[in-house]
Swiss-Prot record:
Temperature notes for this entry: Optimum temperature is 40 degrees Celsius with glucose-pentaacetate as substrate. Active from 30 to 50 degrees Celsius. At temperatures of 30 degrees Celsius and lower, less than 10% of the maximum activity is left. At 50 degrees Celsius, retains 60% of its maximum activity.
Name this polypeptide is given: Acetyl esterase Axe7A
Organism: Xylanibacter ruminicola (strain ATCC 19189 / DSM 19721 / CIP 105475 / JCM 8958 / 23)
Record function comment: Involved in degradation of plant cell wall polysaccharides. Has acetyl esterase activity towards a broad range of substrates including xylose-tetraacetate, 4-O-methylumbelliferyl acetate, glucose-pentaacetate, cephalosporin C, and acetylated xylo-oligosaccharides smaller than xylo-heptaose. Displays no detectable activity on polymeric acetylated xylan.
Family, per entry: Belongs to the carbohydrate esterase 7 family.
GO biological process, one term: xylan catabolic process
Length: 439
């Protein structure tokens, strides 16, 4: 039975349906799957409940389009193509009693097909289904000197002792936990900022590092995940650019102009593995663990990492670099098989195929030292990963590639309906999973 509740309350590993509300006022924008109020409703129901098929099997999807909940006999235009790639077929179908079945076809190789739908060229939706994704493999090579490269960089960074300035933030402190604004010097040239929350009650606690999603930004909502501190965790939410969250808007604007464009740092120095911007970021994550494990109220056993998108990537990177990490949670990880477009299929965020001259031999070589797939190979702690099939930021193709490479104990919450988001319920569930990992 369909549930037309205005808010999603549960995510299941195998979703039967995708319900997509498309706001009329946002009709020309890329619509998320669950705006809470809308006049229009798409329903797309693959004929396999888990949205997965074997290569060679044909996928069929029942499509419905409703206005105010009433089925519409409208013409639907559609295009079908591989995940993140140009369409290879297109067509139109007129709905009868508000419904039609579209044959999406199949794939000869493992991957995902994406069907992009529209009514009147305005009301848009898409749905992706997978074909033997458990067989997907990375394009990215595993450099022979990968481990030596990162050991040398961490050794060099550790010549600079971790130094921390720590100021209590009364406006974020409650009866249950204390909050501190930290500035951590992570190597000779770089520092990061972070908010540390920890239980008010004296004791020994697990530590959790939370790296950020992509962008040039400060930490805007330090109170959004305080349920960690309330459940007995010391948690550090960090940024990666040395941007003080208490700076003024004018200061922020002045500093960020140096970054060229919003996520330009992800291309900065990509010609040379030793000069790539993300080198100090990966090192900073490990140095943050150095700091957390020096705290007198750390329990001496449990070191967790948790994040989404770029933060999911950095969580996996840290787990692959640092054997002290005892459990890892990642949502739809970015920076995964970034050169995958050279295999004529989807690659990972930041989608270098959209820029010029990004796949030179030098840049592809550098990518291999920073790609999540090569850290995933090295993870030994338990891992919990969540991803959705409709994600066009961190596509399911690359999430599966990362998942397939992990040989450590692992669990997944696959939510086919999801684009680039998770619900608050999922985020809380991940905290509960970490709680189960406490030794």
């Amino acid at each position: 039975m369909f549930n037309f509740a205005p808010k999603q309350t549960t995510e299941m590993k195998k979703l039967l349906f995708t319900l997509v509300f498309v706001l009329g006022s946002m009709a020309t924008a890329l619509a998320e799957n669950y705006p809470y109020r809308a006049d229009y409703l798409w329903l797309t129901v693959p004929n396999h409940a888990d949205w997965l098929y074997k290569t060679g099997e044909r996928a069929k999807v029942e499509v419905s389009f409703c206005l105010y909940g009433m089925p519409q006999n409208v013409e639907v235009a559609y295009e079908i193509g591989p995940d993140m790639m140009p369409a290879t077929s297109s067509g139109k179908v007129t709905l009868k009693n508000g419904r039609a079945v579209i044959d999406m076809g199949t794939m000869k190789k493992p991957g995902f097909l994406d069907m992009r739908l529209s009514v009147d060229g305005k009301y848009q939706h898409h749905v992706k289904v997978g074909f033997s994704p458990e067989l997907l493999k990375p394009y990215t090579k595993n450099p022979q000197d990968f481990d030596a490269f990162w050991k040398a960089n961490l050794d060099e960074a550790r010549k600079t002792p971790v130094s921390v300035s720590c100021n209590k933030v009364d406006k974020y402190t409650t009866d249950a936990f204390d909050c501190y604004l930290l500035k951590i010097k992570t190597d000779r040239r770089h520092s990061i900022y972070g908010y540390l929350t920890k239980p008010k009650k004296a004791g020994k606690y697990p530590v959790v590092l939370c790296p950020p999603g992509a962008g040039i930004k400060t930490i805007k909502e330090p109170m959004r995940s305080t349920f960690y501190a309330k459940n007995g965790f010391i948690r550090l939410e960090m940024e990666i650019h040395g941007l003080n969250p208490e700076m003024t808007d004018e200061q922020f604007k002045e500093i960020t102009t140096a970054f060229d464009y919003e996520n330009g740092y992800l291309t900065n120095g990509l010609d040379d593995r030793d000069n790539y911007y993300m080198k100090h970021v990966y090192v900073a994550c490990v140095r943050a663990i150095d700091y957390l494990t020096s705290l007198p109220d750390w329990d001496g056993k449990n070191v967790f990492v948790q994040g989404g998108s770029q933060g999911g990537a950095l969580s996996l990177v840290t787990a692959g670099l640092d054997p002290r990490v005892t459990a890892c949670v990642a949502n739809h990880p970015a920076l995964s098989d970034m050169a995958g477009y050279l295999d004529n299929r989807a690659g990972g965020y930041p989608h270098f195929n959209r820029l010029k001259n990004m796949f030179t031999p030098e840049k592809v070589n550098t990518m291999a030292y920073y790609d999540v797939v090569n850290f995933a190979r090295r993870i030994t702690c338990p891992v919990y990963i969540t991803w959705g099939y409709n994600d066009n930021v961190c596509p399911p193709t690359t999430s599966y590639i990362v998942w397939n490479l992990i040989t450590a104990p692992k669990e997944s919450l696959i939510t086919p309906i999801n684009e680039h988001w998770t619900t608050s319920e999922t985020n809380y569930t991940q905290m509960l999973w970490l709680k189960k990992q406490v030794k």
